[in-house]
Amino acid sequence: MEEMFKEQDFWSFNESSRNSTVGNETFGGNQTVNPLKRNEEVAKVEVTVLALVLFLALAGNLCVLIAIYTAKHTQSRMYYLMKHLSIADLVVAVFQVLPQLIWDITFRFYGPDFLCRLVKYLQTVGMFASTYMLVLMSIDRCIAICQPLRSLHKRKDRCYVIVSWALSLVFSVPQVYIFSLREIGNGVYDCWGDFVQPWGAKAYITWISLTIYIIPVAILGGCYGLISFKIWQNFKRKTKKDQCITLTTAASKANALARVSSVKLVSKAKITTVKMTFVIVLAYIVCWTPFFFVQMWSAWDPEAPREAMPFIISMLLASLNSCCNPWIYMFFAGHLFHDLKQSLLCCSTLYLKSSQCRCDQEHDSRKSNCSTYVIKSTSSQRSITQSSIT
């Protein structure tokens, strides 16, 4: 049984201390970790944080999708990629954060082996998809700034997005074979990983870190290096143009200034999207760097303090990335949420007006019925009076 515990490595995408421990192994000389127990105080903090992250991720990304759907001008590539990044973040929230939250509450995985493998598979699909959509956004902004005359066709955009989702689905397949429902104690079962010893866990975690973090971050760095260089070149050219404009005549000066101002407006629009994508990338790096640092450390160092609080915090910090992006969208593309707010206000106003019209119609119909009844009763009374007189 002890050998089976040693097969379970830190790469289970579970922030709980129960899954980040290796049974009956001693870390730091005299610290023995028992996989059948957990720190209840830490578990309560994890449950609270994950519940908050789940709520913010669901609410924020659903608002982004609704705003993009209801907006008038959302045919650009940027909005298309934003939509798929929000979908990927929703996948992370529903299939990674939510199962982890339930798992932290129940302490053990209660479900069949098929569900264990499915949960582990879907947990990585969202991570791959979110990362690759972010890479696509950065490449798109790099092309828009460095080669503005080159226009990616909408079909190519769709092909790139489909390829990203396909790679996410394929790269997550090893999770199905690594994790299964296993007995970790006398009659105690949990969703546990089985790596080939002694190199299996190291190879797998290194490969995951390369495909989700190291290679994408290198691509992102290259894209923003080119973008920064191109913006610097553009700034120098505009400065020279402004100096040349001051030497022209007054008549041509107005026309030239109008042309330059229009160019500046286009550049500002592009630079705004570049800033937004850069902040999204920065948030991704801040949230995921501690996570992958911890993963690599725990894989290559058998004496890594897996139950130390910095390890737990780094795991929880990774979950925050799925709820950061909507707030970044709101800051840089506030008109989307303003349009959504206006649409909701218009819908509520129309609903109130329609309900008021229905009430007025019902009131008018009741009033007409009452007047008809009064007329009928009055005419009947007159007929009775006339008959009595006669």
Curated annotation (Swiss-Prot):
PROSITE patterns: G_PROTEIN_RECEP_F1_1, G_PROTEIN_RECEP_F1_2. Glycans are attached at residues 14, 19, 24, 30. It is a multi-pass membrane protein. It comes from the Eukaryota. It is found in: Cell membrane. One of its GO terms (molecular function) is oxytocin receptor activity. Residues 1-48, 108-124, 182-206, 298-311 are extracellular. Keywords: Cell membrane, Disulfide bond, G-protein coupled receptor, Glycoprotein, Membrane, Receptor, Transducer, Transmembrane, Transmembrane helix. One of its GO terms (cellular component) is plasma membrane. Residues 70-86, 146-160, 228-276, 333-390 are cytoplasmic. GO terms for biological process: cellular response to hormone stimulus; maternal process involved in parturition; positive regulation of vasoconstriction; regulation of systemic arterial blood pressure by vasopressin. Disulfide bonds join 116-191. InterPro entries: GPCR_Rhodpsn, GPCR_Rhodpsn_7TM, Oxytocn_rcpt, Vasoprsn_rcpt. Expressed in brain, intestine, bladder, skeletal muscle, lateral line, gills and kidney. Pfam families: 7tm_1. The chain crosses the membrane at residues 49-69, 87-107, 125-145, 161-181, 207-227, 277-297, 312-332. Belongs to the G-protein coupled receptor 1 family. Vasopressin/oxytocin receptor subfamily. Binds to isotocin. Can also be activated by vasotocin, mesotocin, oxytocin and Arg-vasopressin, although these have lower potencies than isotocin. Produces an induction of membrane chloride currents indicating that it is coupled to the inositol phosphate/calcium pathway. PANTHER family: NEUROPEPTIDE RECEPTOR-RELATED G-PROTEIN COUPLED RECEPTOR, OXYTOCIN RECEPTOR. This is Isotocin receptor. It comes from Catostomus commersonii (White sucker).
